[in-house]
Regions:
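N-terminal polybasic phosphate/anion-binding patch
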Residues: 2-98
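Phosphate-binding/catalytic loops
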Residues: 2-12, 135-154
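Short glycine-/acidic-enriched loop or helix-start segments at secondary-structure transitions
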Residues: 34, 83, 109-111, 147
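Residue-level signal for inorganic ion chemistry
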Residues: 35, 73, 103, 122, ...
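Acidic/polar active-site rim loop that often engages polyanionic ligands
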Residues: 54-58, 106-108, 147-154
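Glycine-rich phosphate-binding loop
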Residues: 94-104, 108
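Active-site-adjacent loop/tail segments of enzyme domains
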Residues: 104-134
Length: 154
């Protein structure tokens, strides 16, 4: 019968895997709050993506909320990842770093609605939507800077 041995001291003292440092490439206070409430404290870093220009470049495809939200989420994540790699984002520890980019759009009344730009636009949308419903689409891109792996979901 084989003798049972206790794990070696080295195995018992092996450090736990390091939790990745998360960078949220979004200006959305709601996204930051959601992560914080889940016990994750991200570094917040806004991308330099010109959303209006990207949507304009999408042409006819800009009517597809799935495509547009994913296009914007990916562009934001890649922009922030590039900034981190270049050293433009201060206070990022060495090690495992993940960047999240996200964007949401509302499909309502046959249109894709981006962010309202003014208080008046918000009031007009609320009035138009009263008693009706739309569909909110959110695109997410996560980039692992350790291996440049990218995952996209809408």
């Amino acid at each position: 019968m084989a003798e049972r041995r206790a794990p070696s001291d080295a195995a018992q003292l092996a450090p736990a895997p390091q939790r990745p440092h998360l960078i949220l490439g979004s200006a959305s206070p709601a996204r930051a709050t959601l992560l914080t409430n889940a016990g994750i404290t991200p570094t917040i870093w806004h991308s330099g993506v010109d959303e209006d220009a990207l949507i304009a470049d999408a042409g006819d495809r800009a009517t597809d909320p799935i495509l547009v939200t994913q296009l914007l989420a990916t562009a934001k994540a890649r922009d922030v990842a590039d900034q981190v790699r270049s050293g433009a984002v201060p206070g990022i520890p060495a090690g495992h770093v993940l960047v999240i980019g996200a964007d949401s759009m509302l499909a309502f009344g046959g249109k894709v609605l981006g962010k309202a730009r003014t208080a008046q636009e918000i009031l007009e949308r609320w009035a138009a939507m009263s008693g009706r419903s739309g569909v909110l689409f959110t695109g997410h891109t996560v980039i692992d800077l350790t291996n440049d792996r990218q995952v996209d979901r809408t």
